[in-house]
């Protein structure tokens, strides 16, 4: 590894000193720090992002380097209509290329996160495909399902960390969506429901593929899938589906934005590289993942972000004072 690094032996010594003396600073987020960030974030009025204009979602700049993507059909309980499946793909493709964005918070407007697919709007597309040849209808439906699957895969493939903030119901397609996010917070009144079996079909846009890897309990996933029962917030926390539960929506959003602000203050090279390698490691063996990591870092270890971080640590400056270049 030393061979791969193009830094001096003195700087390597500084790196070791940094790891010994400032690990808590770099790897632990204190509740006090999060509370301060949350208060600061709540004072800022969200600003519309000019190149994100949609019918079913709203994108605002919550704070510096942080975007807020909100499911925005509260009168329909944020049901996922035809526009949603197209717009979320467009939205996250833009976010992936947005060099100023370093973290994303996804939430739902109104009384709940989402009620899932909008059956009234989607019925004609799903239930009455054109044509009378079974093979051709099958190919049409396969292409349609693949298109819907991409709607949530773009979240997973987005290199910026995505935090889901869930309140009220998260039903059907909502579980597919949050399973593709990196971090999940919820309110005490939240519940999660894999509803598809009650509609006569198997969930087909990500839940069955991602949820077992998220919570690591195949028996529980099977139970939730086969029965369509509700998983309440406390059970979601115990199972590992969410990492924190909050009393109400405001407290949850404040914490989500505080975490996003903290993440966005870190090196984007380090954060985005970590997300990409975590996802790769989830789907590959340890040996394959270590090899991928070595190949990745043979380039990334040459970043100026390391030098900036070490200098800040040696000067006892807050890491938030470092100015990292856009990525």
Swiss-Prot record:
A motif (Microbody targeting signal) lies at residues 325-327. The modification Phosphoserine is found at residue 267. It comes from Mus musculus (Mouse). This is Delta(3,5)-Delta(2,4)-dienoyl-CoA isomerase, mitochondrial. Its main location: mitochondrion. Isomerization of 3-trans,5-cis-dienoyl-CoA to 2-trans,4-trans-dienoyl-CoA. It comes from the Eukaryota. The modification N6-succinyllysine is found at residues 230, 316. Pathway: Lipid metabolism; fatty acid beta-oxidation. Keywords: Acetylation, Fatty acid metabolism, Isomerase, Lipid metabolism, Mitochondrion, Peroxisome, Phosphoprotein, Transit peptide. The modification N6-acetyllysine is found at residues 147, 326. Belongs to the enoyl-CoA hydratase/isomerase family. Signal peptide: none annotated. One of its GO terms (biological process) is fatty acid beta-oxidation. Residues 1-33 form a transit peptide. PROSITE patterns: ENOYL_COA_HYDRATASE (PS00166). The record marks 196, 204 as: Important for catalytic activity. One of its GO terms (molecular function) is isomerase activity.
């Amino acid at each position: 590894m030393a061979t791969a690094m193009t830094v001096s032996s003195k700087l390597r010594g500084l790196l070791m000193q940094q790891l010994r003396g400032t690990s808590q600073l770099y790897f632990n987020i204190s509740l006090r720090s999060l509370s301060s960030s949350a208060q600061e974030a709540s004072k800022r009025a969200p600003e519309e992002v000019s190149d994100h204009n949609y019918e079913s979602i709203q994108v605002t700049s919550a704070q510096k380097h942080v975007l807020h993507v909100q499911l925005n059909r509260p009168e329909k309980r944020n049901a996922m209509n035809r526009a949603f499946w197209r717009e979320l793909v467009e939205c996250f493709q833009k976010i992936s290329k947005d060099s100023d964005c370093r973290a994303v918070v996804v939430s739902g407007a109104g009384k709940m996160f989402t009620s899932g697919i909008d059956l009234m709007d989607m019925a004609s597309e799903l239930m009455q495909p054109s044509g009378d040849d079974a093979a051709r209808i099958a190919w049409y439906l396969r292409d349609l399902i693949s298109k819907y699957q991409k709607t949530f895969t773009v979240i997973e493939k987005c290199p910026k960390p995505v935090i889901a903030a869930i309140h009220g119901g998260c039903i059907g397609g909502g579980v597919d969506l949050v399973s593709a996010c990196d971090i999940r917070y919820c309110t005490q009144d939240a519940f999660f429901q894999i509803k598809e079996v009650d509609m006569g079909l198997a969930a087909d846009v990500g839940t069955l593929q991602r949820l077992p890897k998220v919570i690591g309990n195949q028996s529980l996933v099977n139970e939730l899938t086969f029965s369509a029962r509700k998983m309440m917030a406390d059970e979601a926390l115990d199972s590992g589906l969410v990492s924190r539960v909050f009393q109400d929506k405001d407290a949850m959003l404040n914490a989500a934005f505080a975490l996003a602000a903290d993440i966005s203050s870190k090196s984007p090279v380090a954060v985005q590289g970590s997300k990409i390698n975590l996802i790769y490691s989830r789907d590959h063996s340890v040996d394959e993942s270590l090899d991928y990591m070595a190949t990745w870092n043979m380039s990334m270890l040459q970043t100026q972000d390391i030098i900036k971080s070490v200098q800040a640590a040696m000067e006892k400056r807050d890491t938030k004072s470092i100015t990292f270049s856009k990525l």
